[in-house]
Amino acid sequence: MFGCLVAGRLVQTAAQQVAEDKFVFDLPDYENINHVVVFMLGTVPFPEGMGGSVYFSYPDSNGMPVWQLLGFVTNGKPSAIFKISGLKSGEGSQHPFGTMNIVRTPSVAQIGISVELLDSLAQQTPVGNAAVSSVDSFTQFTQKMLDNFYNFASSFAVSQAQMTPSPSEMFIPANVVLKWYENFQRRLAQNPLFWKT
């Protein structure tokens, strides 16, 4: 029903069923994992009105599991990418995996999937830094930031006749700012992640 993927590792499709509605994947050597993908295999859909909450569990200093809600998968959203690298020192949250006898070993984390009502999924709050930001939201933010900067800088524009000479201050012509703004927009449209290179 579910699959789990970590970069550089084989895809896991054989989840351990620990209850009728709960499934677990082991993640050995979890300290070296940054992101995990959880997805439906497409062979068995969720029953009508149901979905799956996705949890991440890692052993605390005493070896006890610390569970954190990452998000969910549904028939309408059959896959999700989660960032888990920053979660290993966070606090746990309420979870449905309670006191189940799940075999645990040190340095092995787990992804848990709990089949629940869609209404219940909508009311849950995932841990804040588990979601991977999308390029669209980043592009929107960058566009708003560019617009704000250009509008702010332009609000100080004066003509040469209005300028008061001041040898200690530097001035940037408005057309230079406009040229930078247009160049940045063009590059952002071509590749939203160009700034990483």
Curated annotation (Swiss-Prot):
SS bond partners: none
Keywords linked to the UniProt accession: Cytoplasm, Nucleus, Protein transport, Transport
Organism of derivation: Bos taurus (Bovine)
Function: Acts as a specific nuclear import carrier for HSP70 proteins following heat-shock stress: acts by mediating the nucleoporin-dependent translocation of ATP-bound HSP70 proteins into the nucleus. HSP70 proteins import is required to protect cells from heat shock damages. Does not translocate ADP-bound HSP70 proteins into the nucleus.
Protein name stated in the entry: Protein Hikeshi
Subcellular location: Cytoplasm; Cytoplasm, Cytosol; Nucleus
GO biological process: cellular response to heat; Golgi organization; lung development; protein import into nucleus; protein transport
Region (Required for F-X-F-G repeats-nucleoporins recognition and nuclear import): 18-55
